[in-house]
A protein has these predicted regions:
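Extended amphipathic alpha-helical segments with heptad-repeat/coiled-coil character used for oligomerization
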Residues: 160-163, 168-198, 202
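Conserved small/polar residues in nucleotide/adenosyl-binding loops
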Residues: 215-216
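Short, ordered loop/turn segments at secondary-structure junctions
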Residues: 48, 84-87, 132-133, 143
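Short, charged/polar connector segments at secondary-structure boundaries
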Residues: 1-84, 95, 100-103, 180-181
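Amphipathic heptad-repeat coiled-coil/leucine-zipper-like oligomerization helices
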Residues: 206-209
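Amphipathic alpha-helical transducer elements in NTP-driven molecular machines
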Residues: 24-27, 65, 89, 108-111, ...
Length: 216
């Protein structure tokens, strides 16, 4: 797989749909720095296999989404980039490692990043080794990643939920109705405690019925 360093048109560079980090955040300061000093560190991109109507190759950004956004805001037409051919697995590994090292990700973004690698066949042990995390850490994120989109859509602020809140949501994996109710709750902690009580009461009731059935 060849690697080159080139100056590429910003219009030929596209955000990676598999980037764990979904928002670039505030880029005003970075844009100001780029206007005065230029881009000091090249982006890392990979060809996406497409061309525009003029025949120019198109690329996916692997590292440098914030720099690209700031370059566009600064009015730059080209940016320096390292171009590397890579497969989907390597792309995801690089993006996840890069973002976790910078502590940029929200807990759910990080969880979805690990899930993306799992979908490509990367095991928990290998993910832990590549990101410098423990197996327990990775498994915890993967459990969070299983929270379905329907539940996530219950709250406009879902992406900002804390790790503790996401853990509590994941506890209701086997009860989608309760999970959705908790996701949309205005008072998350109070609702969590109430749902836990309801679940314990239901479990006690079911157990009592089972024992009565055995007695007969």
């Amino acid at each position: 797989m060849g690697i080159t360093i080139e100056n590429l048109q910003v219009d030929d560079l596209h955000a990676n749909p598999n980037n764990p980090r979904k928002q670039v955040g505030d880029i005003d300061e970075l844009a100001s720095s780029i206007r005065s000093q230029g881009i000091k560190q090249p982006l890392l991109v990979t060809p996406n296999g497409e061309t525009d109507i003029d025949g120019h190759k198109q690329y996916r950004v692997v590292i440098g989404h914030r720099r690209l956004a700031a370059a566009k805001q600064s009015g730059l037409s080209t940016v320096p980039a390292i171009v590397e051919e890579m497969d989907a697995r390597r792309e995801r590994e690089i993006m996840l490692v890069e973002n976790t090292q910078r502590s940029d990700l929200t807990p759910i973004e990080e969880a979805d990043g690990y899930q993306g690698l799992l979908d490509l066949g990367v095991g928990v042990k290998e993910m832990a080794e590549k990101t410098g995390r423990s197996g327990r850490f990775v498994r915890r994120r993967l459990k969070i990643a299983r929270i379905p989109q329907e539940t996530r859509d219950m709250s406009a602020d879902f992406s900002q939920l804390s790790l503790d809140q996401l853990d509590k949501l994941a506890e209701f994996e086997s009860d989608p109705d309760m999970q959705r109710e908790l996701a949309r709750a205005d008072d998350f902690d109070w609702t969590y405690q109430r749902l836990c009580r309801e679940r314990r009461k239901t479990a006690w009731h079911d157990k009592a019925l089972e024992e009565i059935g055995r007695a007969h």
